[in-house]
Amino acid sequence: MASHGSSCGACKFLRRKCNRDCVFSPYFSYEQASSHFAAVHKVFGASNVSKHLLHLPQHQRNIAAITISYEALSRMRDPVYGCVAHIFALHQQVVTLQEEIEFLGSQMKNFSYSNQNGSQLNNIPEFVNQMTMATTNFVDESVLNNADGRNCYDGFFTNSEEMLVNHQWLQNMDYYY
């Protein structure tokens, strides 16, 4: 049951009494029922979501609720592509940055060849190779690991007591669309 005797966001949206066994209460707060749970209900249906959550082990329900909510909100914003649109945008950004690095590397090569005096940069091809490898490994390392060495998913899938709708990734979704 939601805190302070109030119903959870799902029960508020569905206009029913929230009891102790409510499968939605740990994941949908009362305050954002109209935005987050409304999208989940419209895209997937409350009955389907509750069945899926009940079939999962307790420790996986928070991750599933976050994923379902993210996908539902994405599908509401972009009915055709859903969350894949965000993935496409990030992929295009990586491709654009790789092209920019290649262009800047060729500019640096041209600069070093035009300045054939003794103090030129001798390691330009090595630098370009390092930069190319850095961008190709971007998704594997930089996106998945933050400065603390933790996986970025660890910051997203927090402890089960945190309300889903208060997570910063879901609050900042407008930034990406």
Curated annotation (Swiss-Prot):
Which residue intervals define the domain LOB in the entry? 6-108
Q: Spell out the coiled coil positions from the record.
A: none
Q: Which Pfam families match?
A: LOB
InterPro entries assigned: LOB
Q: What induces it?
A: By auxin.
Q: In which tissues is it expressed?
A: Expressed in roots.
Family the entry assigns: Belongs to the LOB domain-containing protein family.
Q: What is this protein called?
A: LOB domain-containing protein 33
